Amino acid sequence: MGKSILHVGELGNAKLVKNAMAMFAAVQHMSLVEICCWLRKGGLDEATFRTIVTNSQQDSVATRRIMETVVSRNYKPRKSWMPKDVSFGLDMAREMEVPMPFVGLAYQMFAIAQATSQDGYEATGIACNLYDLINGEKSGKG
């Protein structure tokens, strides 16, 4: 949620922006968790990577929040609305004939999570549990 209300122009633009933010967040969640899994296999723990990200140009409120959840493995058990918003955004992109391959892959990851009952959490928990499943590791808390 943003800190202020912004006028985004014509009627319908707010829905476009809402879905765009969900699409951006979905790719960000999945990519950060994927990178953490790869680094862990290489011997670098998530806490160290969190420190690196926090002290880099990639630092943001979003990356700090995602990395804190990845490190703590304390996932909020709740329904995530992100997959629904991403799906709506992809539908709009198809209608506009705009290819969205990264967002499409993130959406497919959410679909895999749903099919394997890994979707009962907020987005970071979904991503972490899904990547644990893919990598044959024990799922985190949840």
Predicted regions and their residues:
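Hydrophobic alpha-helical segments
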Residues: 131-142
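Ligand/cofactor pocket segment of small-molecule handling proteins
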Residues: 1-18
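A charged, well-structured terminal subsegment
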Residues: 4-8, 81, 86, 140-142
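Helical "substrate-binding/catalytic lid" subdomain
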Residues: 14-133
